[in-house]
Amino acid sequence: MTMCKNKLALAVVLGLGMNSPLWAAEGGIEARLAALEARVLAAEARATAAEARADEAQSKANEARETAVVAKAQSEKVDKQTAGAQGFEFHGYARSGLLVNGNGNGGRGGPYITPAGSVGGAVGRLGNEDDTYMEANLLKTQTFADGSWARYKLMLADGVETSNDWTASDSSLNTRQVFAEIGNLASFDGPFKNAVLWAGKRFDRDNFDIHWLDSDVVFLAGTGGGVYDVQLADSWKANFSLYGRDYGDISASGLSDIESYILTMNNRVGNWQWMVNGLSAKDNETRINDGGAGSEAANKGAHTLLAYHADSFFGINPGFSKAAVLYGHGLGAELKGLGSDSELLPDADAVRLAVFGATDLAPRWRIAPALLAEQSKDRYVKGDEYRWVTLNGRLAQVLSQNVELVYEATWQYMDLAPKGYKGRQAVSGDFTKLTFAPTFKAQTVGFFERPELRVFATWMDWSSELDHYASNDAMGQSNFTAGGEWNFGVQMETWF
């Protein structure tokens, strides 16, 4: 179109020029026409070449844009895959706070503060913690072309009671978990089609706890290997594992490196869980318990758990609830921390009951009750007996989107007859704790929404007889005796 316009303009100019006297005056019309035509053809050639170069440049520009669009799409796809299936994850838990008693000194606290705490009897944790504790979980997941995946996990943890900012000399920083697992393996079929294989040092995936008491119902952990999610029937999955734990040396007998091994089958059928464990610790029977003449430790044991995990609050309200009963014999009589107690006797027996849950009572009120109880005998010394029961209730009143008032009440009864084990005395009595904690949150949408920032006041009291259980526990120490104790403080707690 541009070239046509140029030709028309040139013809007009030529027509006007040929009618002028100057044109007529000069001779050789034909020669002049030939010269003019040559110049026109040359101009057309230059215009055609210029247009071709412009078209080529436009084509290259279009190709460059298309290449850029494709490259951007591919880059976004790779970035999405990297952030997902090939992603790196960071998860954690932490709590930290200040606990001050009514005299202005550092307060005494902790879920295992009572004499029953020496055998696992926890009490409510709200307004009762004086430590800084953190867990950092680093995970890397890879997904392959055939759909199989691999995951690596590292967990670091540390806990201190000092309020100082530099705590290296008091630190207990350690590696609590380091393991790898693989799943969705292409060559696996039948019951193992969706199985997950693992090996390393870890907490068992199916452990569960009562958060309000900071107490696991069952805690299986150590170093070993296993397989999860073997499909034995339509609604029946089973886990199989072997864990090892180190009992250390028995210097009196010259034995070293005594280890406990835990062989586990953990079954899930619908909402039901049935766990069976066998324990063995070769040569552990040469261990003689302090204060128990002739009380040789066990070298084997058994443990079982039956639990129901409900997706409602005991069938009467939305929420959740769990109930579990546990039994253990010999090395299995440590019902919570499987394989963690090397001093249990061959005849040790223990039974534990756990019932807990959480629900909304009304649009602005939430409640979380819990019951935990245990009885054991012939535990460390022939004829000893330990009985305790804890009732705990946490209540939350939502004031606004960011503020709630939290209340917690704990009552624990204990009857302990240690028969002189570690110099401990027989005692019985009860313990009571009441806590009021105004709490600030980014969103007050549930009990388990974190982080929480709390200020609190806690009152505790207990039977005076409990002051005499042991010389090295909290109760009975200076400024911490029966008759009522106040603690005040501030705390943060978070997980993600």
PLM feature segments, named:
Residues 98-106, 144, 160-164, 186-188, ...:
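Gram-negative outer-membrane beta-barrel proteins
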Residues 1-9:
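Bacterial N-terminal signal peptides that target proteins for export
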Residues 19-24:
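Sec/Tat signal peptide C-region and signal peptidase I cleavage site
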Residues 103-126, 164-179, 187-293, 473-478:
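Surface-exposed coil loops of outer-membrane beta-barrel proteins
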Residues 8-18:
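Hydrophobic helical h-region of N-terminal Sec-dependent signal peptides
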Residues 230, 235-239, 256, 261-442, ...:
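Detector for outer-membrane/organellar transmembrane beta-barrel domains
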Residues 91-99, 153-157, 198-202, 239-245, ...:
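Transmembrane beta-strands of outer-membrane beta-barrel proteins
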Residues 25-189, 230-232, 358, 392-405, ...:
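Beta-barrel outer-membrane channel/assembly domains of diderm bacteria
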